[in-house]
Swiss-Prot record:
PROSITE patterns: KS3_1, KS3_2. This is Actinorhodin polyketide putative beta-ketoacyl synthase 1. One of its GO terms (cellular component) is cytosol. Residues 1-35 are annotated as: Disordered. It comes from the Bacteria. InterPro entries: Beta-ketoacyl_synthase (IPR000794), Ketoacyl_synth_AS (IPR018201), Ketoacyl_synth_C (IPR014031), Ketoacyl_synth_N (IPR014030), PKS_Beta-ketoAc_synthase_dom (IPR020841), Thiolase-like (IPR016039). Its EC number is 2.3.1.-. It comes from Streptomyces coelicolor (strain ATCC BAA-471 / A3(2) / M145). The active site is at C212 (for beta-ketoacyl synthase activity), H352 (for beta-ketoacyl synthase activity), H389 (for beta-ketoacyl synthase activity). It is an enzyme of class 2 (transferase). Residues 45-459 form the Ketosynthase family 3 (KS3) domain. Keywords: Acyltransferase, Antibiotic biosynthesis, Transferase. Pathway: Antibiotic biosynthesis; actinorhodin biosynthesis. One of its GO terms (biological process) is antibiotic biosynthetic process.
Length: 467
């Protein structure tokens, strides 16, 4: 229910859902919640499933358009149109066709909310509707939000700075020109608060910012919240809209982005021998996560189960990666162990696949270490070849791609992969999507700062068989 809704008489609510025990048994409510929270102590973790998905991405708003783009092998990378990119080394990006008015945002929301927050809320609304949850039967205190972002409200902060400083010419800030919403832009935790407000979540609400693994880690944190019993429903995912002059210049300075400006559509080429950096992008994905038993009891459509998750830091270098892939391999092993999935049962790997020289080399080594010879039999692909790298959001978009791959039995391709690299010698599904029965898939992320995360997802049929 909305946060400002009037209290509802429990007797008038009719049948209750699996998320809210009958109010006439208050003591039993506490017992049920304690039972859920104590399952972990006895090795009976609550299983977590995805029952709703929402996507806003370059080349596609909503899961249908997103999936059509991924399976077509087309790319959404173009010359930057948001501003004149000619002064910059990298002049290409993957911009989303996002109209906040068409999305239903009113004047007050448009005035208050940064573009990244709008993406997150739009995705949360889509996921909520797709989940089939009835807001009137949810206990708001048992609903939470876990949102990730790498640069949060960078778009609005940069705009406000330009206004305050006369485009950088005046270094004295005149408070009279300051937007009354500057606080909303400055404090990253406003983003999950906006989502909580939109969906009526009064449970645990957290902000995750672990660079390019934020989208994986925010969902992983939400899984933990349900497993430990502190929430029954979590809205989880990530949003980033980093296509701004300062962010573009930032990655220019460290030579992380591509300089293939004369061929934007083919600029993002993970694992290709001619790769020269990633393509900056924007996007968001949000999920509704629930306890498996509760989702089953209400007859929900289960898209996938999140059966394992792990994250770690290599404590090595802010941007550098060791060529042997040891730390990422260990992260993968921990996720597989938690999932109780053997390496030989992984049917597809959704790679981080950023398109930088060192990352793709590092990943290839990690898959060989973690999966052994099975790595050579497993298709690996990078959707960044088509939708670019949306920093903190990409991990959630890649989870969405895995969910859709499991449901459709199709592996998305790695676009633009035409030139082999002897150090990247696995099956990277070049150019064309591939039909394949998928039961268990692995998705990984790697971020500046040494963050490395991995997640195992299972299809609904396999999840049911494991019950």
């Amino acid at each position: 229910m909305p946060l400002d809704a009037a209290p509802v008489d429990p007797a008038s609510r009719g049948p209750v859902s699996a998320f809210e025990p009958p109010s006439s048994h208050g003591a039993d409510d506490d017992d049920d919640h304690r039972t859920n929270a104590s399952k972990e102590l006895f090795g009976l973790k609550r299983r977590v499933v995805i029952t709703g998905v929402g996507v806003r991405a370059p080349g596609g708003n909503g899961t249908r358009q997103f999936w059509e783009l991924l399976t077509s092998g087309r790319t959404a990378t173009r010359r930057i149109s948001f501003f004149d990119p000619s002064p910059y080394r990298s002049q290409v990006a993957a911009e989303a066709d996002f109209d906040p008015v068409a999305e239903g945002f009113g004047p007050r929301e448009l005035d208050r909310m940064d573009r990244a927050s709008q993406f997150a809320v739009a995705c949360a609304r889509e996921a909520f509707a797709a989940s089939g949850l009835d807001p009137d039967t949810l206990d708001p205190a048992r609903v939470g939000v876990s949102l990730g972002s790498a640069v949060a409200a960078a778009t609005s902060l940069e705009r406000e700075y330009l206004l305050l400083s006369d485009s950088g010419r005046d270094w004295e800030v005149d408070a009279a020109w300051l937007s009354r919403h500057m606080f909303d832009y400055l404090v990253p935790s406003v983003m999950p608060a906006e989502v909580a407000w939109a969906v009526g979540a009064e449970g645990p609400v957290t902000m995750v910012s672990t660079g390019c693994t934020s989208g994986l880690d925010s969902v992983g944190n939400a899984v933990r919240a349900i497993e430990e019993g502190s929430a029954d429903v979590m809205f989880a995912g990530a949003a980033d809209t980093p296509i701004t002059p300062i962010v573009v210049a930032c990655f220019d300075a460290i030579r992380a982005t591509t300089a293939r400006n004369d061929d934007p559509e083919h600029a993002s080429r993970p694992f290709d021998g001619t790769r020269d950096g990633f393509v900056l992008a924007e996007g968001a994905a949000m999920f509704v996560l629930e306890d498996y038993d509760s989702a089953l009891a209400r007859g929900a459509r289960i898209h996938a189960e999140i059966s394992g998750y792990a994250t770690r830091c290599n404590a090595y270098h802010m941007t550098g990666l060791k060529a042997d892939g040891r730390e990422m391999a260990e992260t993968i092993r921990v996720a597989l162990d938690e999932s109780r999935t053997d390496a030989t049962d992984i049917d597809y790997i959704n790679a981080h696949g950023s398109g930088t020289r060192q990352n793709d080399r590092h990943e290839t080594a990690a898959y060989k270490r973690a999966l052994g010879e099975h790595a050579r039999r497993t298709p690996v692909s990078s959707i960044k070849s088509m939708v670019g790298h949306s920093l903190g959001a990409i991990g959630s978009l890649e989870i969405a791609a895995c969910v859709l791959a499991l449901e459709h039995g199709v592996v998305p391709p790695t676009a633009n992969l035409r030139t082999s690299d002897p150090e990247c010698d696995l099956d990277y599904v070049p150019l064309e999507a591939r039909e394949r029965k998928l039961r268990s898939v692995l998705t990984v992320g790697s971020g500046f700062g040494g963050f490395q995360s991995a997640m195992v997802l299972r299809d609904a049929e396999t999840a049911g068989a494991a019950a």
